[in-house]
Amino acid sequence: MTSKLEQLKQFTDVVADTGDIEAIRLYKPLDATTNPSLVYKAAQMPQYQALLDTSINGAKSITNSAEQLSAASDNLAVGIGLEILKLVPGRISTEVDARLSFDTNASIAKARHLISLYEKGGVDKSRVLIKLASTWEGIRAAEILEKEGINCNLTLLFGFNQAAACADAGVFLISPFVGRILDWYKANTNKKEYAAEEDPGVVSVRRIYNYYKQHGYNTVVMGASFRNIGEIEALAGCDRLTISPQLLQELDQDKGELKRVLSPDNRGEAIAKLIDTEASFRFGLNQDAMATEKLAEGIRGFVKDQINLENLLKSRAQ
């Protein structure tokens, strides 16, 4: 029998959640996703050292030191993306600086800049997804960018009302997190072990998937942040799944049978349509302790690694 990875590819678009060129070459995903943490990790790999220097040199004409570091990190993120696009037939996701998560206009400006860097590298915007945090401001930025033909990937999505607001905004794709939701429930409840079917992250993505299909939304659901292959198997059939190299390897080595779980034709129990105003969005997020805490934690984590990356670039430039 073929591997579970090959079986999964029959009904789900498999995406590599990494900046590791060798892993992408090995597992042949459709797309790849990056984030500030993955770019920082990739920046320490031997194969990207020349690109670090190119990224720094490309920003030297900027006199303001903070702006110079920001520009160099943008150059690096896009440079890594350009290398990855030589290997994947689909798209690369590149993230807007997480420090802009609550600034709609600055997020739009940064997204346009990233797209311009890709275009200078010979890549059309149709092969790029701009990643934005699923804050109210991030969703509004995505709504405007989508109208300009810049497709977006809304990340750090933990709550149902975040998903509903993204769909209403017409964003191209969302990345609801699975493993980080599980982490929260393990840390904040007495239950420490979950079967895949009852895993709260799996339950969340299934609900979002069924809601989108029931109400005819075209927004792609791409499950993300997996802790084990059981979570992946429980979401087989989801539009897309972005998976780390370690879990891609486990799926590739497992020759067992994989059954499709999610399908547009099997939409589950009816879910009433949710219309988000800014007030209802913020209140709904506030009432969901898990989503509130994990969104804030996720933004802080990406900001930390963005700063770490800029410090790495700064030390290398000296």
From Swiss-Prot:
Classification via Pfam families: TAL_FSA
Transferase keyword on record: yes
CDD domains for the chain: Transaldolase_TalAB (cd00957)
A GO molecular-function annotation: transaldolase activity
Residues annotated as transmembrane: none
Superkingdom in the source lineage: Bacteria
PROSITE patterns: TRANSALDOLASE_1, TRANSALDOLASE_2
EC number: 2.2.1.2
Primary location class: cytoplasm
SUPFAM superfamilies: Aldolase
Pathway assigned to this chain's UniProt record: Carbohydrate degradation; pentose phosphate pathway; D-glyceraldehyde 3-phosphate and beta-D-fructose 6-phosphate from D-ribose 5-phosphate and D-xylulose 5-phosphate (non-oxidative stage): step 2/3
Protein's GO biological process: carbohydrate metabolic process; pentose-phosphate shunt
Catalytic machinery residues: K131
Reaction catalysis annotation: D-sedoheptulose 7-phosphate + D-glyceraldehyde 3-phosphate = D-erythrose 4-phosphate + beta-D-fructose 6-phosphate
GO cellular component terms, A-Z: cytosol
Keywords: Cytoplasm, Pentose shunt, Schiff base, Transferase
Assembly with partners or alone: Homodimer.
PANTHER family the record matches: TRANSALDOLASE
HAMAP family the UniProt entry points to: Transaldolase_1 (MF_00492)
Chain's role: Transaldolase is important for the balance of metabolites in the pentose-phosphate pathway.
Assigned protein family: Belongs to the transaldolase family. Type 1 subfamily.
Protein name (record): Transaldolase
Organism annotation: Cellvibrio japonicus (strain Ueda107)
Gene: tal
